């Protein structure tokens, strides 16, 4: 009996050691600022699609967005063509014409498709075309969640700024933030959304304002920090007692954090004004605008101590596989690049569940959904110090 128990214990120890030895090591290397890597998997070309159809709604308002998405796809296409010889037939189809959409559905049904519905409302599609679209095999890249995608053959890569906001506010909450001021601008206009998310986390919004171009940053912050009220009270008291009172404003003690949802230029203007108005000890969190492209530099002194949530590709991180031309440094390029990567991963039977450290962030594939988390960084002495992906 003792021998049997001993054998069982040894067997369990063996299984434990085996599981530890096969536990994959994270491919990212924070010491080298490497947060973007290729999946650690050997692709079997025979299992990958021989034809990939990329359909999109060509935006008249912002054609550059569609162009950047397609550039990202083709960049990754040529990477795998050169590295492993995988070069499927790549077709690009504009579905702006609903008649053309219906005519091509039969062809699309027989192959793998990438649907770029990121910059246009999918409701622009004819209902018949839309319903057939939901029966395709492939990947939909969307800005707004698609309803009716229950077919396991059609997966959705949902790119949502709201997720970035939620993750960053979660970090603020863990850092002890409770009472906050929210500032958005004309490129975001989402202070109401941020307030709703923060309230759901049991946080309190003391004030929420929009930074408009006609109002200077110093005047805006002086108002929300109640510095003008302090001056008015001092003048009134001086008149009552007949003695000149020196006004020494103190920072508001009823707030502990400020959430900026603005363009990068606006954030660079607001943060120094914040310090000038005696609120330098308040924690500042930034979710950069998606409506206005801008690049972080290697010397962001105006954003000192600000915590930023962003795609790693736009946080000046390094990649472990290739240097990507800086002229392609855009959000939509990163989305297109990762979409093509997902095509390969979703068609590899041995890797149903995976973690991919992509250009847009940490992408996790689970049975029910594909999820993405952005990277977080804090500006220290003008340099970005990378923290981690949101929990």
PLM features: residue spans?
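Extracellular/periplasmic periplasmic-binding protein-like sensory domains
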Residues: 202, 221-235, 253-257, 271-338, ...
């Amino acid at each position: 009996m003792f021998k049997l128990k001993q054998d069982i214990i040894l067997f369990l120890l063996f299984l434990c050691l085996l599981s530890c030895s096969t536990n994959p090591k994270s491919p990212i290397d924070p010491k080298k600022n490497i947060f973007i890597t290729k999946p650690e998997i050997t692709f079997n070309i025979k299992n990958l699609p021989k034809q990939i159809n990329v359909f999109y709604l060509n935006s008249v308002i912002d054609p550059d967005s569609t162009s950047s998405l397609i550039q990202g796809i083709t960049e990754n296409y040529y990477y795998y063509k050169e590295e492993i010889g995988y070069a499927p037939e790549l077709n690009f189809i504009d579905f702006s014409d609903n008649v053309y959409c219906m005519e091509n559905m039969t062809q699309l049904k027989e192959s793998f498709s990438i649907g770029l519905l990121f910059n246009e409302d999918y409701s622009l599609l004819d209902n018949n075309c839309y319903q057939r679209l939901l029966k395709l095999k492939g990947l939909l890249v969307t800005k707004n969640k698609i309803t009716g995608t229950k077919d396991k053959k059609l997966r959705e890569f949902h790119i949502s700024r709201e997720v970035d906001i939620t993750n960053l506010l979660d970090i603020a909450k863990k850092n002890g933030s409770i009472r906050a001021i929210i500032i958005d601008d004309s490129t975001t206009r989402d202070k109401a959304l941020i307030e709703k998310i923060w309230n759901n986390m049991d946080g309190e919004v003391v004030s929420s304002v929009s930074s408009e171009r006609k109002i200077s940053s110093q005047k805006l912050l002086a108002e929300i920090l109640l510095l003008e009220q302090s001056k008015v009270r001092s003048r009134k008291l001086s008149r009552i007692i007949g003695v000149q009172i020196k006004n020494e404003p103190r920072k508001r003690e009823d707030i502990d954090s400020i959430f900026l949802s603005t363009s990068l230029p606006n954030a660079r203007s607001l943060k120094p004004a914040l310090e000038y108005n005696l609120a330098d000890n308040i924690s500042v969190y930034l979710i950069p605008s998606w409506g206005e492209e801008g690049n972080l530099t290697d010397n962001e002194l105006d954003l000192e101590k600000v915590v930023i949530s962003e795609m790693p590709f736009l946080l000046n991180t390094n990649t472990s596989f290739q240097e990507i031309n800086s002229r392609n440094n855009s959000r939509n390029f990163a989305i297109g690049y990762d979409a093509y990567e997902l095509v390969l991963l979703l068609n590899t039977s041995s890797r149903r569940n995976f973690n991919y450290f992509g250009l847009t962030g940490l992408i996790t594939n689970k049975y029910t959904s594909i999820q993405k988390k952005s990277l977080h960084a804090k500006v220290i002495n003008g340099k970005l110090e990378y923290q981690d992906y949101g929990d």
